[in-house]
């Protein structure tokens, strides 16, 4: 069934900033998709087109991206009468029309909005759930429910505290199914709230952009200690492990790292990549840390390689790889990390996201699907993670509706699959392993 009409508009993300929403119409109905937006963005990401008109939304309007859809992309796609199930053809057409390496003409936010809506329409056209359509597009015969990685303590660019490292996550790998993983996550979260309240006072339990707590602590180890305590109080020491997103590019300073980067600058306190690696190794030794994302700057390739070779845990590339097949190929070649963070808006189309995922999986990497800090109520990534069988997703704490929207969709998918539902559990790094 071909596209009858496409209409884009400006809506608001979870931070009150404008973002792109796309309505796509076929004879089967209306299909709507909204595009997320990141705060700590890698310099190699596809371009998110903003208006830069300082008199409107502090320059963050997306009316240009919306106009590119309504005036250029929509007429082209409608006139070509392509079937909505032809995801790759439609994505390629938009990418060719844009003609730039990083989608800077139309904006990745314009192309992605249409791409997501096409994917949703394609599923209905085929009469299958969205996760099944995505599995088909990726060539997967089975589907898998992921382990959720709940970001329960926020620091870095996501929070107004002193904490340098951006996310401290809990992964309920010992759960029997996704529903139990949600219950464990929620119970640990509420225990953590009480632990923080007792130690730092009630105002320390205000939440950050992704629903995690942002107590005013400086020591990253204290974040891990709080998690360990909360996991123990909830009674899940044997079922929950810890993940971190350091987002080290945010505090990389001329070859070194500043773990107090939110204070006035003082080069005497900077530490070397080796010192930072030793700090991570002490965390791994003292706490159940099984995954560290962006431990070093996006161009500090040597430090990545050295750490991945010796750490013995999952090392996730986000700013390093930016869901870009060229960066992933380089990281595979240099053995820089062993897991890809998959963010659809870093690359800007469904087809390229699938290619990035397949490339990582083909090289023995894990893949973690991810939200952005500026989110919407759109639940596409919940179906994406199931269809791609990546086994792990991070989409915030069990708090704030734009985060829960994804987790709740995963609950529905598990329920729909019934006895056929398979949960990644402790195999979250390689859930397809037989």
From Swiss-Prot:
Where does the record place the region Epitope recognized by CAR antibodies? 56-63
- Family that this chain belongs to: Belongs to the enolase family.
Crosslink (Glycyl lysine isopeptide (Lys-Gly) (interchain with G-Cter in SUMO2)) position:
202
What name is this protein filed under?
A: Alpha-enolase
**Could you tell me which residues carry Phosphotyrosine?**
44, 287
Q: In what way is this protein post-translationally modified? A: ISGylated.
Q: How is the cofactor bound?
A: Binds two Mg(2+) per subunit. Required for catalysis and for stabilizing the dimer.
Question: What induces the gene encoding this protein?
Answer: Induced in diffuse large cell lymphoma (DLCL) after treatment with the natural biological agent, Bryo1. Up-regulated in response to enterovirus 71 (EV71) infection (at protein level).
